[in-house]
């Protein structure tokens, strides 16, 4: 619960346990055995961030977070907790502004990225390529860039790999050695990603990650819920999404630490995210 600029987390030894918003950019871990309230704790934090006007992103692996968009219902256990934590005079059941996302486009808005946006480095990590294979993938991306070709989806990447392999003798003097064996290995490595639904993730229109940094009309932060019930069962595609998301955040979010050591850096807008994967 958000009160007086802090998130009221609970009680310990009769004293309130609170989380100050200016400390929320630290990494955190919610741990505990089954049934001890990990998901409830995460939901309380998400709701509190929203009340503070901070957009939230979280992954719903079990499918039990979606109800955050509708008001809860009273129960005997809930009434006891309201009294225990001294919230009787100010607690109200309410829904929160929520946007649902789904890589598989079944339980929410589509989440897409282009192959060009992903880049050869991230793709190589996702596909588990060797150093030689990664080098060839860099060559393929460079040739596409030199020719002004955008790699939108996995079909584009396959077509480009096939094209480079067929014309490798023309490019070897400019870009370096290209072997058909390595190209074939990259094509094989694409199969698991395609089978897990990669054709749904890679494509257009690509998601602008700034769409997750919105507030509702009443000033509360938007809670963005990614449906991961199916996605978590497909680790290659899940890793693709997470690596892409982190790289996008690293690219567009300002670095607060720069201001401390460089007074010429302009004052950036600060956005806090709560992410449980």
Name each region found by the language model.
Residues 46-56, 63-277:
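P-loop NTPase motor domains
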Residues 30-34:
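The conserved Walker
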Residues 41-42:
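Post-Walker A alpha-helix
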Residues 5, 15, 26, 96, ...:
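Residue-level signal for beta-strand positions within conserved beta-sheet cores that form or flank
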Residues 38:
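Conserved lysine of the Walker
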Residues 1-17:
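N-terminal pre-Walker A segment at the start of P-loop NTPase domains
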Residues 15, 23-28, 220-224:
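Pre-Walker A (Motif I) flank of P-loop NTPase domains
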Residues 12-21, 212-214:
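Pre-Walker A adenine-sensing motif
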């Amino acid at each position: 619960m958000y009160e007086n600029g802090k998130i009221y987390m609970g009680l310990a030894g009769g004293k309130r346990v609170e989380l100050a918003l200016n400390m929320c950019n630290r990494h955190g871990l919610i741990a505990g055995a089954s049934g001890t309230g990990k998901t409830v704790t995460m939901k309380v934090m998400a709701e509190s961030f929203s009340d503070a006007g901070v957009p939230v992103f979280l992954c719903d692996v079990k499918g039990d977070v979606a109800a955050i968009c509708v008001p809860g219902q009273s129960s005997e256990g809930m009434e006891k907790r309201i009294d225990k934590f001294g919230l009787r005079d100010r607690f109200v059941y309410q829904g929160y502004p929520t946007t649902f996302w789904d890589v598989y486009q079944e339980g929410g808005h589509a989440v897409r990225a282009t192959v060009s946006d992903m880049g050869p480095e991230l793709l190589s990590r996702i596909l588990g390529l060797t150093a030689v294979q990664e080098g060839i993938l860099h060559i393929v991306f460079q040739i596409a860039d030199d020719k002004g070709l955008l790699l939108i989806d996995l079909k584009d990447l396959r077509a480009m790999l096939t094209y480079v392999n067929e014309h490798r003798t023309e490019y070897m003097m400019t870009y370096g050695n290209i072997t058909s064996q390595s190209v074939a290995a990259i094509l094989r490595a694409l199969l698991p990603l395609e089978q897990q639904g990669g054709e749904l993730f890679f494509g257009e229109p690509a998601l602008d990650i700034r769409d997750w940094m919105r507030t509702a009309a009443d000033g509360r932060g938007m809670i963005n819920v990614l449906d991961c019930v199916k996605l978590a069962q497909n680790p290659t595609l899940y890793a693709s999404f997470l690596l892409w998301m982190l790289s996008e955040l690293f690219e567009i979010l300002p670095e607060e630490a720069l201001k401390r050591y460089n007074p010429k850096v302009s004052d950036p807008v600060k956005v806090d995210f709560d992410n449980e994967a």
